[in-house]
């Protein structure tokens, strides 16, 4: 038996069942329930934890061992993530991961910043790449935690094509272990073309189609 957590009201769902938002929060997690060729597997890298008098989400990075007799036997590196939106479960294959989630919620105002409390324990050593196919690889550099807000204007044209225009951007990377909790940290949200903004960094720009 394996526990899989969601940001949701305090309750328990028993059995291999896909989770659907039960209210109380619009946040979803990368924890996932998969059913591939009749085999049920789960992945959990986001856990509940304590913060002050309340609770918080603990995002971890770990190696999940996936094994099913005669079908698959592999290690997959999983990074815990939370996002506004929902997962589309059960996941039935590993193709095009972003098609398995519906990221984003409608917005009608112009927020100035995202505020949150955080604590970071940065891993020592070089990052590892493992997608379950082939051997694990050690990469150069360091891995970072990242928080981003991307506000978009989306529309569908007369031919059914979906378009998205970047409207607002808030993005920051975190790579150093903190001395305890950092409370009320703010990531500003900038609007329009931010490339000439004093605080602009290359990773904040538009994402190329290749990535």
Regions found by a protein language model. Name each.
Residues 1-115, 130-132, 140-211:
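Aromatic (Trp/Tyr/Phe) and Gly/Pro-enriched flexible surface segments
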Residues 118-138:
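Short amphipathic, basic-aromatic surface patches that mediate peripheral association
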């Amino acid at each position: 038996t394996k526990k899989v957590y969601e940001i949701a009201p305090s309750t328990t769902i028993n059995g291999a069942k896909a989770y659907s938002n039960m209210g109380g929060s619009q946040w979803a997690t990368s924890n996932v329930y998969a059913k591939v060729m009749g085999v049920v597997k789960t992945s959990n890298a986001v856990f509940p934890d304590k913060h002050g008098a309340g609770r918080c989400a603990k995002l971890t990075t770990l190696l999940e061992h996936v094994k099913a007799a005669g079908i698959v036997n592999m290690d997959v590196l999983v990074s815990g993530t939370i996002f506004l939106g929902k997962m589309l479960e059960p996941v039935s294959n590993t193709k095009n991961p972003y098609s398995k989630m519906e990221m984003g919620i409608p917005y009608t105002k112009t927020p100035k910043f995202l505020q949150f409390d955080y604590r970071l324990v940065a891993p020592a050593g070089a990052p590892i790449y493992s997608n379950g196919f082939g051997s694990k690889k050690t990469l150069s550099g360091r891995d970072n935690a990242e928080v981003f807000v991307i506000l978009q204007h989306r529309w569908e044209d007369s031919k059914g094509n979906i378009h998205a225009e970047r409207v607002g951007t808030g993005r920051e990377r975190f790579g150093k272990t903190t001395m305890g909790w950092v409370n009320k940290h703010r990531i500003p949200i900038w609007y329009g073309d931010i490339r000439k903004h004093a605080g602009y960094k290359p990773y904040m720009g538009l994402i190329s189609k290749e990535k």
